[in-house]
Amino acid sequence: MKVFFSIFTLVLFQGTLGADTQGYKWKQLLYNNVTPGSYNPDNMISTAFAYDAEGEKLFLAVPRKLPRVPYTLAEVDTKNSLGVKGKHSPLLNKFSGHKTGKELTSIYQPVIDDCRRLWVVDIGSVEYRSRGAKDYPSHRPAIVAYDLKQPNYPEVVRYYFPTRLVEKPTYFGGFAVDVANPKGDCSETFVYITNFLRGALFIYDHKKQDSWNVTHPTFKAERPTKFDYGGKEYEFKAGIFGITLGDRDSEGNRPAYYLAGSAIKVYSVNTKELKQKGGKLNPELLGNRGKYNDAIALAYDPKTKVIFFAEANTKQVSCWNTQKMPLRMKNTDVVYTSSRFVFGTDISVDSKGGLWFMSNGFPPIRKSEKFKYDFPRYRLMRIMDTQEAIAGTACDMNA
């Protein structure tokens, strides 16, 4: 077995408002049980994560944008990798539910639902044509899920997108998994997948094994987003990108909060409307978050009723309490900021109330993989409790 050390450390930071913020940081992503030299660490670009609090496992998406990515879905056992205590730093392992690492072709985002299923969207192709591209299966995009409650995480869902609905799968953004009744058999589940190029939502009805696309003017970008690097200003334009789900009503429906990647406005729509194939959407404008505060990822916390935003160019994580309407800048606040938190790419609240957020320094700009930083570009941070994260801020109803 070949094991080697990664440029990976777990550090303890002090948040801007005093909350203890634990975090991982990488200069390069390196793999366990993979022969050094068989892959190029510079090609390993992680875009998103999911954390299973019950199993204490961290799952990372590493899309096959560039050649020789060993595993597009990687895993870290955080229970046995106590980096805070400063001993051994874990490498990335193959996902426990896989035998070869080629079971998935390329993913951008993992999501864990309320039934402890890990969901991914396999875009079905690699994004290069050089040597080795044919080593991975090519197929229509697929929604795949694994049961984290079972040993070895068996695959329990695989649904291929209908050909008529496949359009630019490399432009899928974030997605949300909506379980109507987590205390039931979990069969009544919907998946809402954003497409930030087309400005559309792909909706999958798991129980009926059906799917469809919906569009709406609120899914479009408002104007280009600006990103600063190396003294130069770059621009990108992204439609609907982030989506998160609020509290359920008695019928299992809830608000779906969403935003475009190039926008400051936030909207909500009732999932009852999303679940009706061919139905009409009636979104509500909740307000705007303030100039230059564009974000591609957001996460709702049911305990505090707060939505957290990982921002694109401000190097910060912000918050807004949904009980403070309307959404406007004076009702928002900052829970974390760092000059090294470059391009917030993912954020989530785990099942035990921990707030996680990630930056990777890779905005959706052509050749951003060539951007160089003199510090670890990948940062995955955690504040142990969401109430602690917002204490004393405008998002704290008790302040």
From Swiss-Prot:
Q: What is its main location?
A: secreted
Q: In which tissues is it expressed?
A: Salivary gland (at protein level).
Q: Where in the cell is it found?
A: Secreted
Keyword Acetylation on this protein?
Answer: no
Q: Provide the Gene Ontology terms for cellular component.
A: extracellular region
Which cysteine-cysteine pairs are annotated as disulfide bonds in the entry? 115-186, 319-395
Q: Where is the signal peptide?
A: 1-18
* Sorted UniProt keywords: Allergen, Disulfide bond, Glycoprotein, Secreted, Signal
Q: A Pfam family for this UniProt protein?
A: MRJP
Q: Where is carbohydrate linked to this protein?
A: 213
The record's misc note reads:
Vaccination against the protein protects mice from different Leishmania species, such as Leishmania major and Leishmania braziliensis, when infection occurs in the presence of L.longipalpis salivary gland homogenates or after L.longipalpis bites.
Q: What does the protein in this record do?
A: Probably modulates blood feeding of sand flies on vertebrate species by binding and sequestering different mediators involved in the host response. Binds biogenic amines. Binds serotonin with high affinity. Binds adrenaline and noradrenaline. Binds dopamine and octopamine. Poorly binds histamine. Induces a delayed type hypersensitivity response in host tissues. Induces systemic Th1 immune response in the host. Immunogenic; elicits antibody production in the host.
Task: Spell out the family assignment given in the record's similarity comment.
Answer: Belongs to the major royal jelly protein family.
Annotated protein name in UniProt: Yellow-related salivary protein LJM11
